[in-house]
Regions:
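Well-ordered alpha-helical scaffold segments within catalytic/enzyme domains
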Residues: 4-19, 60-75, 112, 126-138
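Low-complexity, glycine/alanine/valine/leucine- and proline-rich hydrophobic stretches
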Residues: 151-237
């Protein structure tokens, strides 16, 4: 949201006269993406914490700012304005600044554990990509629009291209059921940032300190296997199938000698997880629920 589609919209706006065909193609991609990406935002302005580079914080809303910059009205301007304004208010209510007023490394509070190997003290300032909204002319309709709530969205929304099922609760929070996302180049805590069974806009997720004790491994929304004092979790999937009737199926192996078949099935008030474990030796399995916020 704050990378490929963001830069594509910059190109679409700046090059719409010189390269109209490509610019329109990028705008159309953004229209399609927006109709799915809106499911990542909760009613209070928070976005789903998922994946890497989370220390960029309110860059999460930069896509919507780029939509306005490129004049792509997927939803009414009041809806887009509401997404942006609520998002900023949510972030600025969190302890994300140090005593000098500088952005800290972390997510909703200072937290080095969630950071990437490529992060540095100035990394959080990628959040300022969202300030692209300040490039809108005074006559842009977004400034005149009245802030609106999110439109009525499906309580369950399927994203087959990313092997995700998005759930929207009546209180406005968002859950993503996931399987199959994997970063081949192994960023820090790739399993925790991409391969948990569920991610939630309120509860967030844990990153481990180590895998040698259960409290340090903290496998929230994961199935962990203990072997010789070490905990193993899902890092990647061998097979993934998404079926609207059966749910999200994955076959994975946390270590040699163990294979697991997992099915995630969404319901109106939550989801069900079913695991079939094939193990060549005795082991201890531990499953975690959502972490405390």
């Amino acid at each position: 949201g704050f990378a490929m589609h963001f830069y594509s919209l910059l190109y679409a706006k700046l090059m719409e006269k010189e390269d109209p065909e490509r610019s329109e193609k990028y705008k159309e991609r953004a229209r399609l993406f927006a109709k799915d990406f809106i499911y990542w935002f909760g009613a209070r302005g928070e976005a789903l914490p998922y994946g890497r580079s989370l220390t960029y914080r309110f860059a999460q809303v930069s896509f919507w700012c780029a939509l306005a910059f490129a004049n792509v009205e997927v939803f009414p301007w009041g809806v887009i304005k509401g997404i942006i304004n609520r998002h900023f208010r949510w972030w600025f209510s969190k302890p994300i600044f140090d005593s000098e007023g500088k952005l800290t490394l972390g997510y909703s509070y200072p937290n080095l554990t969630v950071c990437e190997g490529y992060n540095a003290p100035n990394s959080p300032y990628w959040a300022l990509k969202s300030f692209l909204i300040l490039a809108l002319p005074e006559t842009h309709p977004l400034w005149e629009a009245k802030e609106e709530e999110l439109p009525v969205l499906d309580s369950i929304h399927y994203l087959p291209h990313s092997w995700m099922i998005m759930q929207r609760e009546k209180d406005g929070y968002v859950t993503a059921l996931t399987s199959g996302q994997y970063a081949e180049w192994q960023p820090v805590h790739v399993a925790e940032k991409f391969e948990k069974f569920a991610y939630h806009s309120y509860f967030g997720f844990q990153s481990p300190r180590s895998y040698y004790t259960l409290p340090q491994a903290s496998p929230d929304n994961m199935l962990a296997f203990e072997r010789d004092g070490y905990y193993f979790v899902r890092r990647r999937c061998m097979e993934v199938l998404l079926d609207k009737e059966k749910g999200l199926y994955s076959r994975w192996s946390p270590m040699e000698g163990i294979q697991v078949e997992t099915t995630l099935k969404p319901y109106e008030k939550g989801h069900m997880r079913t695991h079939i474990i094939h193990a060549d030796f005795p082991c201890i399995a531990v499953e975690g629920g959502f972490s405390l916020p």
